[in-house]
Amino acid sequence: MVVLAAAICTKNGKALLSRQFSEMTKSRVEGLLAAFPKLIGLGRQHTFIETENIRYVYQPLESLYIVLITNKNSNILEDLETLHLLAKLVPEYSNFDEYDISKNAFELIFTFDEVIAMGYKERVTLQQIKHFISMESHEEERFRMEEKIKQKEAQILASSKAKEIERMRHEEMLRGKRSGGYTGISGGGGMGSGGMGSNQYRDNDRDNYHSNNNNNNNNNNNNNNNNNNNRDRDRGDSPNTSRPSAASSGSQGGMILGGKSGTNKNSAIAQVLKEEKIVEKVEDVEQLLDSQISQIPETPTVPQEGVHITVEESFTSFVESDGTVESIDIKGGLSVQINDQSLGKVKVNLKQGKLSKQFQFITHPNIDKALFGEQSVLRLRDGGKGFPSGGILKWRCKTNQESMMPIRVNCWPSPGRDSTTVNLEYDSLVGYELKSVFIVIPNPTSNAPIINQFDGLYEYDNKQKCVIWKIPLIDDSNRQGSMEFSVKGNTQSFFPVKIQFTASQTICDTTVGSVFVEDSNQSTNFSTETTLSVDTYEIK
């Protein structure tokens, strides 16, 4: 006998799980595990401890320990190999907390039995053990497939039955409409004996029809007159008609002109979301939709002057889950569009802030590079005919400095007893406005999360299985914000977190100061359109 027991315990020595491979009492196992933490010295780098009779081979698992209790004659290298295999298997079936270990105790014991038999390590791999534990059966799989086929056939049959019922109902409605002009008017019995299609006319024999044709025509005329009078009387006197009035039918299914179509649309969307079980109350989602419409800022249209300058910049960043900035890549460009050809050649004076010194600038070959380097002025070289259409200035900065980020987002999943609480917070690091900020967090389960607290707006995408935190506008009134929700899941399953935003100012802090006509050296009116957008911003 080599391995006496395999166990998982806390750092205080509390036994959470133990599988004995020799005759050992419960009190002895608990005593050995309780003494184990006291034997670990501070700052020790070893993974085993020897006493007079036994050896502890252990490995930390976050706040827990996985321990092999062996005799002193065992092969330490083989024991370490066994320990490492068990350490790889535990996270496949449980999280590293007391509640999950106790909840999945039987699955973990089964894995221990697959690795160790009679105290000796089995020659198995990780994939083989996972296959054994899954206990797949060909008969069971075939039974499941047959059940799925039966369910599909039942769904098809139910669908065909529903279509048949709908078709029959439609035919009955059509037949009712055809006969409604004769039978539907009598309702409360107001037709009388002189109504349309009198008993006298119906009692005549078909053989006598031609001989009595003239008399019948006269009778029909009288009957028609009586019918019209009776119809008018029924409309005025009979309150219980079988056919609803035009006003009531219009109010039920007709289109109301001049109504609030936006409110009706929101109500319809809210009803669909409630039926899909995305929200609990229709009123909540209607209020959310109304607030979204009112709070999302509109993008204004910039009127173009004779000289129109477009500045575009894209932001890319990857951040580790602990907040360490892995990389930041900022790319930008400036283009000039001459709408008034009578201006001729122009030169553009730029204003560059402090952050622009960290960027590398590249000018178009047709631009005077020396003048730009000395005075930050963009003008054509001698002999140039016009500004290139594809842009005249580009810049780029690759860094890992957090100060170059317009907004910083932190995600803190904290595992609990029944669920994981996810805390999110954002912090705007710039003084200008950020618009349409979207923070998307994946949901590892099919259950909708419980939102405990949030700033701004939020939405749960049931199909994509993600929580979307929305902040329509970040300015001086809300430079910081937070959100908290709870849902079951492993801490790493809430990543990557993706962030999107836009702004009307660049990180490079390069703006247009003035535009001059070269021939007259007179300033001219110009318009600018500046956009900062996110290419990729992820917390991994």
Swiss-Prot record:
Residues 212-229 have a biased composition (Low complexity). The keyword Translocase does not apply. This is Coatomer subunit delta. The keyword Iron-sulfur does not apply. Residues 179-197, 251-261 have a biased composition (Gly residues). It holds the Pfam family Clat_adaptor_s. GO terms for biological process: endoplasmic reticulum to Golgi vesicle-mediated transport; Golgi localization; protein transport; retrograde vesicle-mediated transport, Golgi to endoplasmic reticulum. Residues 169-263 are annotated as: Disordered. It is a peripheral membrane protein. The gene is copd. Residues 304-540 form the MHD domain. The lineage of its organism: Eukaryota, Amoebozoa, Evosea, Eumycetozoa, Dictyostelia. It is found in: Cytoplasm; Golgi apparatus membrane; Cytoplasmic vesicle, COPI-coated vesicle membrane. Keywords: Cytoplasm, Cytoplasmic vesicle, ER-Golgi transport, Golgi apparatus, Membrane, Protein transport, Transport. GO terms for cellular component: COPI vesicle coat; Golgi membrane; phagocytic vesicle. It comes from Dictyostelium discoideum (Social amoeba). Belongs to the adaptor complexes medium subunit family. Delta-COP subfamily. InterPro entries: AP2_Mu_C_sf, AP_mu_sigma_su, Coatomer_dsu, Longin-like_dom_sf, MHD. Oligomeric complex that consists of at least the alpha, beta, beta', gamma, delta, epsilon and zeta subunits. Residues 238-250 have a biased composition (Polar residues). The coatomer is a cytosolic protein complex that binds to dilysine motifs and reversibly associates with Golgi non-clathrin-coated vesicles, which further mediate biosynthetic protein transport from the ER, via the Golgi up to the trans Golgi network. Coatomer complex is required for budding from Golgi membranes, and is essential for the retrograde Golgi-to-ER transport of dilysine-tagged proteins. Its main location: cytoplasm.
